[in-house]
Amino acid sequence: MTAKCVMVLGTTSGAGKSWLTTALCRHYARQGLKVAPFKAQNMSNNARVVAGGEIGSAQYFQALAARAVPDVRMNPLLLKPERDTHSQVVLMGQVDEALSRMPWRGRSASVWPVIHGALDQLMAENDVVVIEGAGSPAEINLASSDIVNMRVAQHAHAVCLLVTDIDRGGAFAHLYGTWALLPEHERGLIKGYVLNKFRGDASLLAPAPQMLQDLTGVPTVATLPMWWQHGLPEEDGVFDMTPTLATSCAALHPGEALAAWGGPAPLTHLRTVAVVAYPRISNLDEFQPLKNVPGVRLVWVRSPAQLAGLGADDWIVLPGSKNTSGDLAWLRTQGLDQAVTAHAARGGAVLGICGGLQMLGEALIDPHDIDGNAPGLGLLPLVTVFARDKTVRHTSAGFAALAAPWNKLSGLSVQGYEIHHGQTQQHAAMAAAGDVARAVMPDGLAWQNAAGNVLAVYLHGLFENPGVLQAIFGATTPTLDSVFDGLANFIEQHFEAGVLASLIV
């Protein structure tokens, strides 16, 4: 079996490559074909646990859309930024310290055999491989070391779509400029342009698509309407970033309801869930289901002013972090540490997840210089020591009896995943003095303070458990499967007739 390969390239980051790749995976899977996604290199702190290690979240969801088992070969190289000038390199699911220390240009030659080897295997096992590019294929300063865009396209003999975000303006210049900067032998791989996020009357685009085709020989094969709530989280950034607590996500997009996995929610709210968006936030996609919970408003905060209006029933969430000590220092610089502790002192609910759990303790100790030593926020009498080896695993566990306001989780079994270096335990001196945190999951996976309002868990994916949403909010959300079908329906409606079939002929 040698797969037909369809590749989604973009004129920029954020053009719509990831969700279009996901939609194509589900479309071809619905035709009865065996489908796999592939992205040679992904730079993201959003990762999921699969057999053999971790891959980018986007490829994980693309695999589910393809009705395939997620596999490290689908994203052989994952770069997880820790600082502005340094990333942790994950090769075939596992951290590679030597590659992490290597300059980027030197790294490319080393990893290319692994990348094309993974792609070759997927092509041999599937009918269709849907490949996602990264950034723009016309980054001419990077072309000599390319391992993710046109080099992959040529290796796979892929039929390429070039997608652009028309809502940003300059879409036709982006498309023409990208095509023009490619060498002639690479231009021929691009078989169609996709205009994404269009608002208004599509007839007003004329005569630009035909003029572009006259210049390049490439037709525009789809004009996709603006669709705020397609149901997938943004891959690279905080979705629906709100400037103030008073500005709801719905207000940013008039007429559009909040959505989690794609469904509607009312515009009124009973509880605000304020997630602190520090610079190295990780696994932010796990909060996507909260966007669809009736009565909940999910907001992202970066300053104390955004927390000024929180009430007793509102939550502050400290999410995961790829640089826990660095993000904790940023928290203090912003004054958010005082805002969090003040909310907790008033009895307000605080939830820490993974790196957020570590921040809530007394101290972070780093003997291997992974994240650096740092004092914690002191809301839980815990100490975290960063180990050299990373814990990467799926985990199922049950909550013990919990005090309010988290009591509705008592006895509930949940599934999730762990990705962390830290090992956390009680602060010995404080425990000896009677100041202890309650372990509310086995093996130190979750802790609660004596007052009950601060809960910390190592598990990512808490809100992806339907039982959690039902217990806390009395809510149900659409299934991922229905979201994937919605994506496929959308592109089937808006692509030109016959195009999707022609891509794999």
Describe the residue ranges of each PLM region.
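Immediate flanking context of iron-sulfur cluster ligation sites
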Residues: 345
